[in-house]
Amino acid sequence: MEININCDLGEKSKHHSDENDPKLLEIVNSANVACGYHAGDEDSMNQVVKICKKNGVSIGAHPSFNDPENFGRKRLNLSSDEINKLLIDQYEILQNIAEKHGEIVTHIKPHGALNNMACEDIELATIIAKSICNFNKDLIYLVPTGSKMEEAAKKFDMRIACEIFA
């Protein structure tokens, strides 16, 4: 078993500061980068990607519901097409920024309510897993151990990393 220290970063918003991001990027192996829907913007994504590259940290997309007012923590009921679009849009903006630095997005981990809902709901978990497979089947999908997300990911034979919190 390999341990990968992972952290959510680039989450500058009215709810959070990103002042500690550079220090955290000295100790983590991989970063889940906010993609602008719950927090962050192109500037913060660019800064995190730049430091990730410097420190050899894997870059991951951290997509969420478009809910900056509640930091992506409000549960929203969206159609499968809407879920697919929000995942693709957020992944693509981060991937485009990463490419400008000669990097790629290596993994994806949903944020907040989107993640929490998918942990409990196999239908939503399946929509997310299928969407990820459709836009980049090589991404590592970070999922909570024993969740509906893990179950759905296995149906699609996805590369997964099971997370635990310490």
Residue ranges and their predicted role:
Residues 21, 31-38, 69-84, 118-122, ...:
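Glycine-rich tight-turn/loop motif centered on a GG-T
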Residues 100-148:
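Hydrophobic, well-structured mid-protein blocks that either form specific transmembrane helices
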